[in-house]
Amino acid sequence: MNVFLAPAKLNLALKITGRRSDGYHLLDSIFTFISLFDLLYIEIPPEDKLQFKSTKREINGEDNLIIQAAKALRQTTGCKKGARIFLKKMIPLGAGLGGGSSDAATALLALNHLWNLHLQRAELITLASSLGADIPFFIGAHNARVQGIGEKIRPITLPKSYYFVLYPNVTISTKTVFSFFSLLTEKNTTRIIPPLDNWPEGNDLQETTFRLYPELKQVKALLQPFGEVAMTGSGSALFIKVKDRL
């Protein structure tokens, strides 16, 4: 049995810079990896069937991103091999920590290796772009500035930092948050994150998320005495930068 780590991420800054004609929002964001992981256990059976189970029953269906990624990889390469995949879910669902995207990216990387497909990382990123906006970042395996709808990835070097991350046991629908987010309420619809030595703080989705889930605003208020509180992705996880490992 092969074991693969699927890391979580934080958005240190997230700005919405526009919207495409097809409805997809454009973003400019700083992504960083954190030491929270899902675990993928994968073995290659003699038959060509794809099998998947998880510790979270609500994601055990055929529409799971891991199965979608495996099917897309087989379709792209013509591979006929199967896989048995078990996911030990440690990253909370609907938290803005990128767990589902990371799982899919890790599956692509793992199966590319286990099936001996030898696709280059750039080819996997192209494939990942068709599956979800955050998945290409996790293929890149490096802290990055991410733009567009997630397909423009520029690796960056960040200083070593520690974060206290709180999951308030609230599951957020990213689709719902974006559907309620309106650029018409923004004073400037073409904002771009400035040079990395002068990032803005904050998250353009926070106000919308707090309106939809007002309990998160209360949680943030409780955390503020301990430092500057930020939200990752569309929520619900909040984080504070701290000086040392707790």
Give the location of each predicted region.
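Glycine/serine-rich anion-binding loops at beta->alpha junctions
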Residues: 86-115, 133, 228-242
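Short, basic/glycine-rich phosphate-binding loops at helix/coil junctions
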Residues: 46-59, 107, 129, 194-203
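Conserved, helical-rich catalytic subdomain that frames metal- and/or nucleotide-binding sites
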Residues: 50, 138-228, 241-245
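ATP-binding N-lobe of GHMP and related small-molecule kinases
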Residues: 1-95, 113, 117-122, 149, ...
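Residue-level signal for inorganic ion chemistry
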Residues: 12, 40-42, 66, 100, ...
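Conserved glycine-rich phosphate/nucleotide-binding loop
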Residues: 2-3, 244-246
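Contiguous, small/hydrophobic- and glycine-enriched helical/loop subdomains that border
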Residues: 104, 108-145
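Short beta-strand scaffold segments in enzyme catalytic cores
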Residues: 38-42, 134-138, 144-145, 238-240
